[in-house]
From Swiss-Prot:
Coiled coil feature spans: none
CC annotations in GO: cytoplasm
InterPro entries: aa-tRNA-synth_I_CS, Arg-tRNA-ligase, Arg-tRNA-synth_N, Arg-tRNA-synth_N_sf, ArgRS_core, DALR_anticod-bd, Rossmann-like_a/b/a_fold, tRNAsynth_Ia_anticodon-bd
A Pfam family: tRNA-synt_1d
Family that this chain belongs to: Belongs to the class-I aminoacyl-tRNA synthetase family.
Name of encoding gene: argS
The EC number(s) this enzyme carries: 6.1.1.19
UniProt keyword annotation of Aminoacyl-tRNA synthetase present: yes
Protein name: Arginine--tRNA ligase
Entry keywords, A to Z: Aminoacyl-tRNA synthetase, ATP-binding, Cytoplasm, Ligase, Nucleotide-binding, Protein biosynthesis
GO terms (BP aspect): arginyl-tRNA aminoacylation
């Protein structure tokens, strides 16, 4: 936050004047006890060895260097050498001016400095409609991209279309089975096929287009025709569902293009040249144990079939060839065992996996309705589609709920609770805070009550504890965006918004606004709340959630 950056600059300058470099392990953070000020730092303890002074002595010299700064209300030495710093009310009041000036741009940063990041997410096989688990991954990925862009990174989002594997063959076979069933042919139910009702219209399409001709073709050819149609229709449905969910992908990347372009063979040759792949027992292996994996991994099975990992190696090699500095993979939590081998893959490609690869795991969603959990299984056709959930609760509620917890934590999604218009509903709680402020301005206009323009003189009236608490929280928003970007954690924005909305609701109940006692005080409080509403709107935009003026 601005306060942290200012304090760091002041301390760094004071240390530099004593010939001391900034200590690496220095912390600047709010103290546990608010009575100790706004920020506390251990800089004197971290720098005492370099300064050749006891920590408290160095802290005292730093205190004296900072004491004259007009933005600081107090600087105190505490304990073994901590510095406790409090800023003036005028400093915090200035935040309202910052928000008013920046508007929709409040919270936009340049910490990314244009670093190129690719975020690949959802990437569900086009074998059926997106389910609610995919929806959570979609919300996390899209919101992360928004956060990274807000922080100054250059971001490209991508959907990897698994169109060349076994699951696609099963889809084709499933459609052909339903086709034969609908046409009246005697059939035996396959052991492994997609049982969802969505397969039946696809089979009917085959009847409408081909009549009984598929029965006259070789099974493999008929299956392939069914597969191609199913893939095309299901992928179109996926794109529509994501569009309705306000999720955008810049690139749709088919796995089949890797094979067609020879990218898999090129990756294999690179691994061979580096002595990181070998033939054994009729199969082709990647020496992933050389990079800490628990065993080497098969790339090509003895029967000649590529493993998923083979395509993933080629795909990630392609990502880095496209010039991305960092690639982010967002996977379901059931892929956690896949992370070590993917890091080994990135290492084999000559990149540092800790710097170049970020894997975000998204845990399961337990969907509740009527107090009971809904059982889901894609293969069995028992699942709640993302489209159904969005239709029932809306994109706003669904996105906010998906981002209401860390992505690697299980999430209970109560369809009934999220539709309630009550303060117990976190989506309503935050959106209503924004609408509440807009309602105050509408009422002021109805009453003919003028609202003075934002100015330091007007904001100087904001001196109560409630005023300052709200101002300090407002000032933390850019820091929240920075933290969410640096840690790839968009849920931090959700947490912040709930905190800010809570402070606003409490402020509203304790402090009269339109009837504040004087026109200037009413205007000052309205300008403060206007800044809060603007910040809520900006934060909700990062989550892909609307900020309605009326509710």
């Amino acid at each position: 936050m601005r306060a942290t950056a200012i304090l760091r600059d002041l301390l760094a300058s004071a240390l530099e004047n004593q010939g001391i470099a900034w200590p690496v392990k220095t912390t600047i953070e709010p103290p546990r006890d608010k009575a100790h000020g706004d920020l506390a730092t251990n800089v004197a303890m971290m720098a005492s060895k370099a300064a050749k002074k006891p920590p408290r002595e160095l802290a005292e010299s730093l205190r004296q260097a900072l004491a004259a700064d007009p933005r600081l209300a107090s600087v105190e030495v505490a304990g073994p050498g901590f510095l406790n710093v409090a800023f003036t009310p005028a400093f915090w009041q200035e935040t309202v001016c910052d928000v008013a000036k920046a508007g929709d741009g409040y919270g936009l940063l340049d910490i990314g400095q244009g670093v190129k990041i690719q975020v690949e997410f959802v990437s569900a096989n086009p074998t059926g409609p997106l389910h609610i688990g995919h929806g959570r991954g979609a919300a996390v990925g899209d919101s992360l991209a928004r956060v990274l862009r807000a922080a100054g990174f250059t971001v490209e989002t991508e959907y990897y279309i698994n169109d060349a594997g076994r699951q696609m063959r099963i889809l084709g076979m499933s459609i052909l089975y339903r086709y034969k069933e609908l046409i009246g042919e005697p059939v035996t139910e396959p052991e492994d096929y997609y049982r969802g009702e969505y397969v039946i219209p696809l089979a009917q399409d085959m009847i409408d287009a081909h009549g009984r001709k598929l029965l006259e073709m070789p099974e493999a050819e008929a299956t392939d025709i069914c597969r191609l149609h199913g893939e095309r229709e299901i992928l179109a449905g996926i794109k529509k569902d994501l569009e309705d969910f306000r999720v955008h992908h810049d690139v749709w990347f088919p796995e089949s293009t890797l094979l067609a372009a020879g990218a898999v063979d090129a990756a294999f040759n690179e691994l061979r040249d580096k002595k990181l792949a070998y033939d054994q027992d009729g199969a082709f292996w990647f020496a992933s144990t050389a990079f800490g994996d628990d065993k080497d991994r098969v790339l090509v099975k003895s029967g000649g079939e590529l493993t998923y990992f083979a395509s993933d190696i080629a795909y990630h090699a392609d990502k880095f060839r496209r010039g991305f500095d960092v690639v982010v993979d967002i996977w379901g939590a059931d892929h956690h065992g896949y992370v070590p081998r993917m890091k080994a893959c990135v290492s084999a490609l000559g990149r540092d996996p800790e710097a170049s690869l970020k894997v975000i795991l998204v845990q399961l969603v337990n969907l509740l309705k009527g107090g009971e959990q809904i059982a889901m299984s894609t293969r069995a056709g028992k699942f709640e589609t993302l489209a159904d959930v969005v239709k029932e609760v809306g994109a706003d509620s669904a996105r906010f709920m998906f981002l209401s917890r860390k992505s690697d934590s299980h999430l209970d999604f109560d369809l009934d609770a999220v539709k309630e218009k009550s303060m117990d509903n976190p989506v309503y709680y935050v959106q209503y805070a924004h609408a509440r402020v807009r309602s105050l301005f509408a009422k002021a206009q109805e009453r003919g009550q003028a609202v003075a323009e934002t100015s330091p003189e007007l904001l100087a009236l904001l001196t109560t504890d409630e005023d300052l608490e709200l101002l300090k929280l407002l000032e933390q928003y850019p820091d929240t965006v920075a933290a969410a970007a640096r840690t790839f954690s968009p849920h931090l924005v959700s947490f912040y918004l709930r905190d800010l909305a809570g402070r606003l609701h409490r402020y509203y109940t304790v402090n009269p606004v339109l009837t504040a006692g004087s026109d200037d005080l009413a205007s000052a409080r309205l300008r403060l709340l206007d800044a809060v509403a603007q910040t809520i709107k900006n934060g909700l935009d990062l989550l892909g959630v609307s900020a309605p003026d009326k509710m």
